[in-house]
């Protein structure tokens, strides 16, 4: 048994996404063993539910209540039916959705079991009237980047104020310990906050695909190429067992290897 139901962490969980042009949705479904997650019937159910989640608006209760095609059951009842059929517990844990008025929502799956199922699912929304194929290409690369770096926010403006305040307090305390004059300390804090942004804010991070330019500059560069504004509107990152402390791999290196091999 690989599943700790008290913490919702299962080594055999799957995340899955579905995209449809300017919108995309992602789900996480827990099962008890790797055998089930490798089962084609189970994968079909996961894929079907991911497709239905495009119409659920990111609301789990709405998704659970939607009709599951060809069965006369809703999604929640279908999950219960699968439990009875396969003989193992499973749980539709969460869903989320991303949509833009014009542009694309692109997806990337890390540690994929199938192209749209695996261990880390990322959706990225790019808003633009420009060429959709090129937007899709950059969107997928940024999604790879997000899988590797796990940013805290899309932009500085939408960084959690409590997170920023906590970091400022830590940096201020560290700077004061240096014993330097107050005006120097203020400059030190400003510099360190900028460095913090570059670590945790997607638009400020160095793009792992090229290792040189910031993500916001890569997006702006595509806008110039297309002759149309491109705005990075947001991202969703689902990793199995999000919020639970566990051993972390070097995803940046893994993603870089995946890109170079693509």
Which residues does each predicted region cover?
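N-terminal assembly/interaction segments in proteins that build large macromolecular machines
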Residues: 1, 6-262
């Amino acid at each position: 048994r690989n599943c700790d139901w008290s913490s919702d962490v299962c080594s055999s969980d799957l995340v899955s996404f579905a995209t449809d042009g300017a919108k995309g949705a992602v789900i996480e479904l827990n099962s008890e063993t790797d055998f089930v997650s490798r089962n084609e019937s189970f994968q079909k159910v996961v894929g079907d539910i991911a497709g239905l989640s495009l119409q659920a608006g990111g609301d789990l209760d709405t998704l659970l209540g939607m009709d599951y095609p060809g069965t006369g059951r809703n999604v929640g009842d279908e999950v219960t039916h699968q439990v009875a059929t396969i003989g193992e517990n499973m749980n539709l844990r969460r869903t989320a959705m991303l949509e833009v008025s014009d542009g694309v929502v692109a997806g990337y799956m890390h540690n994929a079991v199938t192209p749209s199922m695996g261990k880390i699912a990322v959706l990225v929304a790019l808003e633009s009237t420009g060429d959709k194929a090129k937007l899709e290409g950059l969107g997928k690369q940024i999604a790879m980047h997000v899988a590797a770096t796990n940013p805290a926010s899309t932009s500085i403006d939408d960084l959690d104020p409590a997170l920023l305040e906590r970091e400022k307090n830590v940096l201020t305390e560290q700077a004061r310990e240096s014993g330097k004059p107050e005006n120097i300390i203020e400059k030190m804090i400003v510099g360190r906050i900028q460095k913090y942004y570059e670590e945790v804010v997607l638009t400020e991070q160095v793009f792992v695909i090229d290792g040189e330019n910031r993500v916001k500059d890569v997006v702006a560069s595509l806008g110039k190429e297309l002759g149309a504004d491109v705005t990075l509107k947001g991202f969703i990152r689902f990793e199995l067992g999000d919020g639970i402390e566990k051993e972390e791999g070097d995803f940046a290196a893994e993603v870089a290897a995946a890109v170079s091999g693509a």
